[in-house]
């Protein structure tokens, strides 16, 4: 690869790294071309971009970012990067599901919002709720609280009326 082409790749990868909420490094050595195409298709369905990049070019692209030195140990052998733009957990789900039937795909490391996760954290990452799911749950809790306020007020009013009625009966 010529120098200007390498610089272009570094620039593109740097831009993708800046835009990504989640970055996942994988090893794909031993995956057939057909399996790799299948994996890319699964990533595409999940809204994730998956790209094979040389380790030296990834290192250069990461040099601008904080915590890049923590990802350096994972940049050995063949490396592909999964960029999670909208959902930082989507790549973890795809990798987990795909690696169950394809042992050649190996998760190396991930960085989500500057926090680095090792290969042992993939199961936990894949089970996390998405931002949308968390917002939905929070909205449901708030809705339940708001809906229960009138019931509590009605119960207090009913009890007050009952007490007043009892006092009135006692005075008669």
Swiss-Prot record:
One of its GO terms (biological process) is translation. GO terms for molecular function: large ribosomal subunit rRNA binding. Pfam families: Ribosomal_L10. Keywords: Ribonucleoprotein, Ribosomal protein, RNA-binding, rRNA-binding. It comes from the Bacteria. GO terms for cellular component: ribonucleoprotein complex; ribosome. PANTHER family: 39S RIBOSOMAL PROTEIN L10, MITOCHONDRIAL. Part of the ribosomal stalk of the 50S ribosomal subunit. The N-terminus interacts with L11 and the large rRNA to form the base of the stalk. The C-terminus forms an elongated spine to which L12 dimers bind in a sequential fashion forming a multimeric L10(L12)X complex. NCBIfam families: PRK00099.1-1. Belongs to the universal ribosomal protein uL10 family. Forms part of the ribosomal stalk, playing a central role in the interaction of the ribosome with GTP-bound translation factors. This is Large ribosomal subunit protein uL10. It comes from Chlorobium luteolum (strain DSM 273 / BCRC 81028 / 2530) (Pelodictyon luteolum).
């Amino acid at each position: 690869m010529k120098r200007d082409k390498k610089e272009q790749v570094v620039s593109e990868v740097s831009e993708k790294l800046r835009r990504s909420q989640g970055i996942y490094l994988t090893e794909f050595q031993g995956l057939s071309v057909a399996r790799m195409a299948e994996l890319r298709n699964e990533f595409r369905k999940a809204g994730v971009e998956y790209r094979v990049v040389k380790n030296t070019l990834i290192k250069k692209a990461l040099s601008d970012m904080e915590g890049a030195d923590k990802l350096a140990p994972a940049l050995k052998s063949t490396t592909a990067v999964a960029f999670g733009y909208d959902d930082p957990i989507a790549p973890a789900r795809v990798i987990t599901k795909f690696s169950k039937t394809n042992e050649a795909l190996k998760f190396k490391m991930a960085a989500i919002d500057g926090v680095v996760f090792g290969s042992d954290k993939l199961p936990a990452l894949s089970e996390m709720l998405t931002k949308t799911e968390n917002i939905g749950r929070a909205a449901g809790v708030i809705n339940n609280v708001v809906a229960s306020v009138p019931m509590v007020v009605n119960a207090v009013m009913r009890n007050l009326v009952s007490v007043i009625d009892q006092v009135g009966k006692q005075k008669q």
